[in-house]
A protein has these predicted regions:
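NAD(P)H-binding glycine-rich loop region in Rossmannoid oxidoreductase-like domains
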Residues: 35-95, 99-102, 203-207
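Conserved Rossmann-fold NAD(P)-dependent oxidoreductase catalytic core, especially the SDR/UDP-sugar
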Residues: 26-28, 34, 91-137
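Glycine/proline-rich active-site loop of Rossmann-fold NAD(P)-dependent oxidoreductases
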Residues: 168-175, 202-211
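SDR active-site strand-loop-helix element
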Residues: 6, 30, 73-74, 108-114, ...
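Substrate-positioning beta->alpha
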Residues: 141, 186-200, 211
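N-terminal Rossmann NAD(P)H-binding glycine-rich loop of SDR-like oxidoreductase domains
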Residues: 3-25
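Non-catalytic, hydrophobic alpha-helical segments
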Residues: 12, 70, 145, 159, ...
Length: 214
């Protein structure tokens, strides 16, 4: 499978990229800093590092050409300003979806977060407070960005992991259709390594397009 990865140098993104390469997939990492990507990921016969900005529609479309799936593991820096108010995804996601789908990619996996949008209906009271107070700026940005790309929904799979940790993964991670989730206790946490596994599982099945997962 040919995978275009956005956010390949992030803490979750590089884990995903390594796992995809270990499974024998061909990966194109579209990155702002190619030197950082090479240092972090190393050279690999199935890895192509393409430098480019997320707002460079022409370059992103070129990188998307011939890919089976796009996986976005983008995230903004956790600064006080971002927590209060953010437009990071609103400014980028519409451009990304237009460029990628315009190049013929029919499956786009987006890493979102548990508690974003309608997923908050299944959250516990403590988790709802986290979503509406602590993470308000970032989560509101994601919701507004999603509203800007509804025309691409048939192509999109969203993953909604809980609070990410840097602990070793447990393995054997399962993904669930978000529509089947009724209630989750406490504040869910998951290792980034397990999230990377889940994202790859979702990406490998094109029939997952149009479905949200937990």
């Amino acid at each position: 499978m040919k995978i275009l990865v956005l956010g390949a140098t992030g803490r979750t993104g590089y884990l995903f990229t390594r796992k995809a390469l270990e499974e024998g997939h061909t990966v194109t990492a579209y990155v702002r800093n190619p030197d950082k990507a090479l240092t972090l990921l190393g050279a690999h016969q199935n890895l192509t590092i393409v430098p480019g900005a997320l707002n460079d529609a022409e370059q992103l479309a070129a990188a998307s050409s011939g890919q089976d799936v796009m996986v976005s593991i983008l995230g903004q820096k956790a600064t006080v300003r971002e927590f209060l108010s953010s437009t990071f995804m609103q400014e980028r996601l519409p451009l990304i979806m237009e460029a990628v789908t315009g190049a013929g990619v029919k499956h786009c996996v987006l890493m979102s977060a548990y508690g974003v949008g309608d997923t908050v209906r299944t959250a516990s009271l403590p988790m709802r407070l986290v979503c509406k107070v602590i993470m308000r700026g970032i989560f509101t940005d994601k919701v507004k960005a999603d509203a800007l790309v509804t025309e691409y929904q048939p192509y999109i799979s969203r993953a909604h992991p809980g609070r990410l940790t840097d602990k070793p993964g447990k393995g054997g991670v399962k993904v669930f259709d978000m529509a089947s989730v009724k209630r989750t206790p406490g504040i869910p946490t998951i290792a980034r390594e397990d999230v990377a596994d889940a994202l790859l599982t979702i990406a490998k099945n094109p029939q997952n397009a149009g479905t949200d997962f937990w």
